[in-house]
Amino acid sequence: LKPAGYVSGALGKWHLGLTEEYHAINRGFDEFYGFMGRGAHPYFDHSDMSHPIYRGLTPIKEEGYLTTRITEEAVDFIGRHKDEPFFLYVAYNAVHAPPEAPEEDIKQVTGDETRDTLMAMIKHLDNGVGEIVNALKKHFLFDNTLLIFLTDNGGSGTMHANNAPLRGFKQMDYEGGIHVPFIVSWPAELEGGKKCEVPMWSI
């Protein structure tokens, strides 16, 4: 996209290699905030500098709930690049293990106790996506922005997910492990409310 004049950013989980050679910055992105692969990353404790949060190629000491920080970085990126074409890849760590959420979010959940933290994590992620959408609307970019929301696998049994009516969980070939949401929004070009039956694969 660079030859077409786009600025690009990658935020969150970079699951495409662990060495500097495969870092997002060395794969064409202009900006990066997040961590390198290895599956999970703690949501609150970012002190392990052997598995750090990066800004660009530089490991940084960070504080705050990771889902919140990724959202804040996304909103900031949109504000800084609102007057030029951009591509922003936002890969939330949520709702991957470990099950960690802000206490105030957990208190708002009144479901099965074993699922309260997972539900709070989903709520926090949902709010984050809403903040990104609101940032696009604030800068009058929403209608002409292609927005894609998807996940890489079904819910995890160890995280007390419930994929019903689909059978199975993450790491299974049943539909509960691989049949996931894929939502596209582009008001200027696509009519809303439609359903596409063509299979999609996100990897």
Spell out what each predicted region is.
Residues 1-203:
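Formylglycine-dependent sulfatase
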